[in-house]
Structure formats: structure tokens, C-alpha cells
């Protein structure tokens, strides 16, 4: 093979290699920019995707042994660099029954915006949370109604003395080349 024919062959091989590489790498790069699948309209309803949660009818004269309200800070949007630039976040509020033997009942899980206005009631009826079980409540990234000062208030009760549940929020954004995630922990705000 002469030097001239190898010089002509090299650009042809390089072009084929680059075309193949582009076909393999481009879809991977583009999928990294994907904002995620469209959310299911029922994704925030625990009954639709957390079948272990059972609705409970509490009698009007129900007297719990323990009851608390937990405030959980949530960030639907955060500022970066200045107040004109924001990142929208998906949030999952997880309420975990830490008691090894006894159930707790979640009476209310409410989502409030930065202005303090109620945005959503996540429960239509109280739900039972078995020992060591968890209940998750999702605010999709596309729901920015809560703003930078959003929060949840979780009201729970128990029939007997129990270990207090743990309530946390996990906020995540993966919509660009950089991802961000952080956690905030709930705090008891009311104990009758």
C-alpha cells in the first residue's frame, strides 16, 4: 500500500469512526439533559403509590395517648448567585414510624407556601403507619407554588406511648449538568 492510498483511507476511517461515535454518544448526552418523565397526575396521592398505607376512621370521641404536630421545611425553589436566579427542586417528605412494635396514625399532612397559605392537603382521611414503615409525600419539581419558604405540617397520633416518628424532606434537582440535593429535618411544634 502506498503512502498516498493510506492517506486517503485515514480520513475515511476517521469519518466512519466519528459517525459511529456520534451515534453512540449523542443519545447518552441528550438523555442527560432530559428533565424527566412527565409526572403521573396521582403521584402525590399516597393511596395511588403506597399501598401499605391504610385509611383509618377515627371515632369522634377518640382520645390518643400521644399526639404531635411536626413542621418540616421544604424548598420548592432556591436562589443562587442572586434573587433573580433560581433552581426548582423536587421534594419528598418522608414520615417514618420509628417504633418497633406499635402503629401511629397520620391525621393530616398539609403543604404550605412561602406566604403561609395552605396549598394542598395530602390526606383525605387519616392513614395508619405500621411499625418501622414510612409514608412519602412528593412535590414535583414542576410545582413551584411553594417557593423558597414552603413547609409541611404533619399531625400524628398514637393509641399508646410510642417512639416519636422521624419526618424529613429530601430536595433534589437533576435537570442540568450539575445536580443538587439536601435534607431538612422536621421539628415538633405542638404537643397538647
Regions found by a protein language model. Give the residues of each.
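Bacterial signal peptide processing site
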Residues: 34-37
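N-terminal secretory signal peptides that target proteins for export/translocation
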Residues: 1-15
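Terminal connector regions
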Residues: 42-49, 143-192
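Intrinsically disordered, low-complexity Pro/Gly/Ser/Thr-rich segments with frequent PxxP/GP/PP motifs
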Residues: 114-151
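C-terminal motif of bacterial Sec signal peptides marking the signal peptidase cleavage site
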Residues: 28-32
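Asparagine-centered strand-capping/turn motif at beta-strand->loop junctions
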Residues: 95-102
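Short, solvent-exposed loop/turn segments enriched in Ser/Thr/Gly
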Residues: 86-92
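Post-signal peptide N-terminal segment of mature Sec-exported envelope proteins
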Residues: 41-64
Amino acid at each position: 500500500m502506498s503512502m498516498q492510498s493510506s492517506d486517503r483511507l485515514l480520513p475515511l476511517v476517521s469519518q466512519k469512526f466519528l459517525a459511529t461515535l456520534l451515534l453512540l454518544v449523542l443519545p447518552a448526552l441528550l438523555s442527560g439533559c432530559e428533565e424527566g418523565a412527565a409526572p403521573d397526575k396521582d403521584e402525590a396521592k399516597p393511596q395511588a403509590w403506597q399501598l401499605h398505607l391504610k385509611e383509618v376512621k377515627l371515632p369522634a370521641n377518640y382520645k390518643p395517648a400521644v399526639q404531635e404536630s411536626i413542621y418540616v421545611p421544604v424548598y420548592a425553589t432556591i436562589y443562587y448567585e442572586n434573587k433573580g436566579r433560581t433552581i426548582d427542586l423536587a421534594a419528598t417528605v418522608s414520615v417514618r414510624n420509628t417504633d418497633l412494635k406499635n402503629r401511629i396514625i397520620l391525621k393530616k399532612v398539609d403543604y404550605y407556601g412561602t406566604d403561609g397559605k395552605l396549598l394542598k392537603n395530602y390526606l383525605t382521611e387519616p392513614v395508619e403507619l405500621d411499625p418501622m414503615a414510612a409514608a412519602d409525600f412528593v412535590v414535583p419539581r414542576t410545582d413551584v407554588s411553594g417557593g423558597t419558604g414552603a413547609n409541611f405540617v404533619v399531625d400524628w397520633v398514637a393509641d399508646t406511648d410510642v417512639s416519636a416518628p422521624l419526618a424529613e424532606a429530601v430536595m433534589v434537582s437533576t435537570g442540568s449538568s450539575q445536580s443538587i440535593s439536601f435534607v431538612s429535618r422536621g421539628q415538633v411544634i405542638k404537643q397538647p
